[in-house]
Amino acid sequence: MTLQQQIIKALGAKPQINAEEEIRRSVDFLKSYLQTYPFIKSLVLGISGGQDSTLAGKLCQMAINELRQETGNESLQFIAVRLPYGVQADEQDCQDAIAFIQPDRVLTVNIKGAVLASEQALREACIELSDFVRGNEKARERMKAQYSIAGMTSGVVVGTDHAAEAITGFFTKYGDGGTDINPLYRLNKRQGKQLLAALGCPEHLYKKAPTADLEDDRPSLPDEVALGVTYDNIDDYLEGKNVPQQVARTIENWYLKTEHKRRPPITVFDDFWKK
């Protein structure tokens, strides 16, 4: 088995999907989890205005709506969390995503004060954060807020990780990568677009250039620039297609060096890191 085949198998990626079937699969997955653990009353998700959180948010609200109708349990809710750092550059996109999702509840937590306070505390301990590490601080502060909200609403935190993100480890460890349940896991980027199109999402929310937008020195840096490959390249690779050798090397290098991000903390029983 080639490394490409191993990666595809590990991430559960498929070369083709039926959008309606995958929507149903994710919604049923969320419903089944909530029914298995009836003490869970809320799904909590940060909404950025990008493709992934818009899709995950819509699926969450659909699952909650169906469960309330089927069970009569009105205590169930989906909480969409706005988590700007100061003023968000694509604020209108975020508002458009909220309008599309129609969440039960919307909370806004501006993380700038908390990030600056943490940075100052570290500075007083003689640790000066680089712009890149400050970006990770933002991602972790966002997740911290979501877990506090989940803790106070008997909830779980929903993630947006999918195959095209997991393959490169393009997330912050214990930031946006630290979640409870990931309904998009298995899909690549273009497949996520297919689901949003089937759901009637405004096109500009999934046709915009994806960006983590964590770095102050490089605001709205496109993911594809940071990664050195395009999502079309990544999606082709995940679909088992032949890609240029340099593209394959770049993708596989990202996969191998970020393996620790896709695993629990390493123990004496693990040996993957010895490869």
Swiss-Prot record:
Organism superkingdom: Bacteria
Entry binding sites for ATP: G46, I47, S48, G49, G50, Q51, D52, S53, T160, K189, T211
UniProt binding sites for Mg(2+): D52, E165
Keyword ATP-binding: yes
Chain coiled-coil ranges: none
Gene Ontology CC terms: cytoplasm
Record CDD domains: NAD_synthase
GO molecular function annotations of the record: ATP binding; glutaminase activity; metal ion binding; NAD+ synthase (glutamine-hydrolyzing) activity; NAD+ synthase activity
Annotated function: Catalyzes the ATP-dependent amidation of deamido-NAD to form NAD. Uses ammonia as a nitrogen source.
Protein name: NH(3)-dependent NAD(+) synthetase
Gene: nadE
